[in-house]
């Protein structure tokens, strides 16, 4: 689910000024992303806890925050681990929009 993604010319995620975040948000509209999210949720159901890690130390500088938004849209509780002894609940990105009428549930950033 990770990695640098290119933005689409038909992007619906123009709220992201950062091209790499917009590219990942565009990727979040694909079948490949939804399949990865489905696998992640199977792991969550089996173990009740899953950690997603990346090179960036803080979630708001990483695509993990977008994955967390997608999970929140599906009513999954997401904790951001800041340090060994510090965690906080992830809050949906302020300009995110959720379309629960579409299946799978769509999240985008206009």
Residue spans for each PLM region:
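Residues lining hydrophobic/aromatic ligand-binding pockets adjacent to catalytic sites
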Residues: 1-110
